Regions:
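Short, Lys/Arg-rich N-terminal segment immediately upstream of the first membrane anchor
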Residues: 1-7
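Hydrophobic membrane-insertion alpha-helices, especially the h-region
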Residues: 9-25
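Electrostatic cytochrome c docking/interface patches
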Residues: 29-50, 63
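The canonical Cys-X-X-Cys-His
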Residues: 50-62, 118, 140
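Short cysteine/histidine-rich zinc-coordinating motifs and their immediately flanking basic loops
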Residues: 66-72
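Extracytoplasmic electron-transfer domains, predominantly the class I c-type cytochrome c fold
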Residues: 75-126
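C-terminal capping alpha-helices of c-type cytochrome domains
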Residues: 116-117, 124-151
């Protein structure tokens, strides 16, 4: 009796699955729409830190790396950027400010940065320049709080 699940057949099946996954066109959503409204930054340093650590997911200025076009990584990256833009988009600043009625935006940002939730660890592995020192984290938290207060 022939075995159906031999290592060779499993390997061939896995390769076919990877090939077929490439036909799901998530890269069509890898867009950078024009900015609606931008924050009035409290300082150029705050802006530079936000660009370095936040803008790839939380703005319409995403730099889409080559691996964002290859499945299954493209699915994860597209989902993360869409989610990041939905929660906080620096290029749609007025919408971000209007959503802070339940929990103030500066407190949300402070909590996530100080807990090490943002930027996520898997992001900083691929983007080591996004890693912020403790001083830079505090400077970003303080600068964003001032930027939010200035509206």
């Amino acid at each position: 009796m022939r075995k159906w699940f031999t290592p060779r057949r499993l390997a061939i099946g896995a390769v076919w699955l990877l090939v077929l996954m490439q036909f799901v066109p998530t890269w069509l959503w890898n867009t950078n729409p024009p900015a609606q409204s931008k924050p009035h930054w409290d300082s150029p340093q705050t802006h530079a830190l936000a660009q370095r650590a936040c803008f790839d997911c939380h703005s319409n200025q995403t730099l889409w790396p080559w691996y964002s076009y290859i499945a299954p990584g493209s699915w994860l990256i597209t989902r993360d950027v869409s989610s990041g833009r939905r929660h906080l988009n620096f290029d749609d600043w007025q919408t971000a400010l209007s959503r802070q009625d339940r929990f103030p935006l500066d407190q949300q940002i402070q909590r996530q940065i100080s807990r090490g939730e943002m930027p996520p660890r898997y992001f900083t592995v691929l983007h080591p320049n996004a890693v912020l020192s403790a001083d830079e984290q505090q400077q970003l938290i303080d600068g964003l709080a001032k930027t939010i207060q200035a509206k």
